[in-house]
Amino acid sequence: MKKLLLMLVACMATMTAFAGDEGEGWSKGFTPVADKADLAGIHTVVAADGSVFASSTYNQAFQFAGKAVTDPDGLLSSCVLKYDAQGNELWAVSLVGKCKIYAMAADTDGTLYIAGQSQDEKVVITDTQGHEKEIQNPKRLSPFFEEFVSANEGFFAKIDKNGVLQSIVTLIPEVNPDILAIVGDPYEMGMEGSIYDYSFNDPVYVLPRKIVLDGDKVYVAAGFTGDIAELGWKGCYLNYFGMNESIFDIKSFGLFSMDKNLLNLASIATVQATEKVQTMSQYYPETIDFVVYDGVPHVAFIGGGELTLTTAAGSKNFAFEVTDDGLNHALVLANVNAPEQPKVFNAAPVDYLGAKFNLVDATLADGNCIMAGTFYGNFPLDNTVTKDKNVSFVASIKMSDCSVNWAKANEVESEAQCMIVTGEEIHAATADAHYVFRTSDGDLKKAENQGFNDASCYNDQYCSTIFTQENSVVVFSPKMKPSGIDETTALKNGATKYYNVNGVELSAPQKGLNIIKTADGVKKVTVK
């Protein structure tokens, strides 16, 4: 308890980075595991009323909101906790069974959407009314080990503001027996240069990365291997050394949508190796992210070799240089309605097994896409910058023409964890540091030695962050400055600015509620 109290004191000291000199807000902690190595799935999201959701793995019983969270019987399970805007504990929902939550999003009415992965034959969700729902994860025969193992399926759940489970859907990856003989990780077989990120005895997977609510749709980005029947996605199998049968499946990424009842799933885009690869050359996408701009998804991905972006509007092939010096890890931005007109940011080839390429978030602000991630070697967004270590970055890209407004790379070895934009500030975090940039020009305003696992904000009014310390999880919500819309400076030409109900700027009014601010500062709400 003493250790947790010290954490909360340190946490309060960092709040000034969000709230100015006042440092007001609240901070709470809980201890869900006995060993810090078991902490995972650490995420947070803040709702329109300022209430805060937090997720974590857990393997020991603990109290929350005056009740015991369902005993996981030692299983590394997951839980979702809710606090009100003042930090009071409200409720907990448990997911008992080996699983992990990877992303969360909250609707304006307080409804919570979670995206995770089940790694167990069965995961039981227990809501606040005691209702139980099982996530079934069927076992399959692993040809190499001749035993049955569970696939790592993706699951998506809708929980109302009172913690009552509304609906759930799963995506179960299938092994194509006519193509795939063995699935696994070459590292487990002593092969270097692995391009696979799952264990040798895990056949296939769906790994959610991001979930976004826009209008009446839920958008999800995910990594996958194998075939996903519900979306029509196919694995991109490796014909290793020209053998007649594939023995590995190269990771792919996709974006799909569903309605808010988690029905009517539809594929939007996939990024995969162009053809069945016959060598261990690194032809694969590394990561994916997206934004929804004027109701249209725009994807961003990093990858190398021969890749194909496929959407309902068509497809686009890419060929990124592979040389003796390594691989050109390019960053690509594309409108899913016009995949044939992407913006490609190339980089000089780099050859380093430990290179990290990742996008942790992309969001819209003032007509720009603000993104954060990690790279190694030559910086795709600024080729004058080259690093001999993995470093985090933050960048601003103009949506109208995909030109780079500015791009900043870290000076120290680091990996990006999360990012949020609050008005004229970008808060980007690594595991052990928090950086504050000015949105307009990327100027570094402040840096603190306290990293975050995740962060969330709503309309510049509410914010939540979450991080770990030893085997505990800390959630804090600083008191924010006035709404970014209230503080917005009118464009010099006197143009009217449009926002959706979440405070995201639009190029024009969209269907539904719109907030309009005129040059003289007058705001009004209209329905289109």
Model region roles, listed by residue range:
Residues 511-513:
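Extracellular Ig-like/FN3 beta-sandwich strand-entry sites
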Residues 1-4, 528:
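Positively charged n-region of N-terminal signal peptides that target proteins for export
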Residues 20-482:
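A sequence-level/structural motif corresponding to short, flexible coil/turn segments enriched
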Residues 515-528:
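C-terminal tail/sorting-segment detector
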Residues 476-504:
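Residue-level detector of functionally pivotal "anchor" positions at catalytic/ligand-binding pockets or at interdomain
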Residues 9-18:
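Hydrophobic h-region of N-terminal signal peptides that target proteins for export
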Residues 72, 136, 507-509, 526:
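Short linear motifs in exposed loops
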